[in-house]
Amino acid sequence: QAEDGIRDVERSRGLGDVYKRQFHMLDKTKFYINGEWVNPSKKNDFDVINPSNEEVCAKITLGNLEDTDKAIQSAKKAFETWKETSKQERVALLEKLLKIYNERYDEMTDAITTELGCPRDWCSANQTSSGASHIEDFIKRLKEFNFEPGFDKGSKNQILYEPIGVCGLITPWNWPINQIALKVVPALATGCTMILKPSEIAPLSGMLFAEMIHEAGFPSGVFNLVNSDGAGVGTILSGHKDVDMVSFTGSTRAGRLITKNAADTIKRVCLELGGKGGNIVFADSYPDAVRDGIRNVMSNSGQSCDAPTRMLVERSIYERAVKELSLIHISEPTRPLYISYAVFCL
C-alpha cells in the first residue's frame, strides 16, 4: 500500500517533481574528478531531455580537453597506489558500494526513468536491477579469481595478472547503469583507475553512481566522471597517451573512429558495437512465439542491442501477430504495463 501511495503521488505531481525531489542535492553541471565535484573549466551547458514529455529535466556541462586531461592525470596518479591494493581491500569497497546501491535503489530507478523515459516499474525490475546484479556478480568473481596462478604443474614459471592502468570508459544511453556497471566495476575490481564518459543524453544515472562510489570510500582519483559528447571527450580519451585502454559500447561507426584514433598510442581497445538479427516465426512455432517476439522488441522501446526489431511471420499467422502488436500501448512511464517514448523518439 505504501508503494502504491508513492506511485499515486508521482502520478499527481508528474515525473518532473519526482526528479527534483530525488536530485536536488546533485549539481549536474559539475564533474567528479579526484574525489570531488568540480566546476568545468569552461561553461558549455547541455539540456537533458525527459523523452516521455520532451521537457528539460536537467542541465549538464560538456567537458573539454582541459577537463578530461585533469581527470586523466588524477587517474594516472591514483593508479600508482590503487594497483597495489589487495584483493580483500577491493572486495570490501565493492561490497560497500553494493550496499549503498541497494539502499539508493529507488533513486537510481527515478534517474533512469527520467533520463530514458521508460516505464518506472519495468525500469526498476530490469534497468536498475542489472546494476545491482553486475556488482554482486563481479564481487563473486573477484573473490574466486587467482591473480598469480601457476604456469604448468611442476613449472617454475609464474603467471601474474596485473591491472592494465588508466581506462577510458564510454557508455551508451539505452542501458545506462547496466553498461556503467559492466565497465566500471571490473575495472575497480582488477585495480585499474578510470574516467567514465556516460552518454550526454542519459547522464543522471552515471552521476548518481559517482555519488555512490564516493560514499563507499574509494580513494580519490580512482574513479572520475566527465560529461560530454563522443566527438569531445570520447575522442580525447581514445587518443590520449596516458590512457592505457578504452572500452566503448555504441555504434559501429563510432567504434571504427575510436579504433583508428587509438592506433597511434597502441592502447587496448574493447568494443561492443551494434547488431541485430531478424526474428522469423513460422506457423508451427511454439504457441507464444509471436507474443514473446513482440515483447522482446517492445521491451525498452526496442532500444536494445539484441532486440529482434524485424519480425518475419508466416502468412497464415500474420493476423495473430498484428493482434498481439495492437495490445501494446504507449503512455506515461509512471503508469504500469505500458511502453513509453524512449530517447530515439526525440
Language-model segments: which ranges?
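ALDH superfamily catalytic-core signature
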Residues: G239, R253-S331, R335, S340
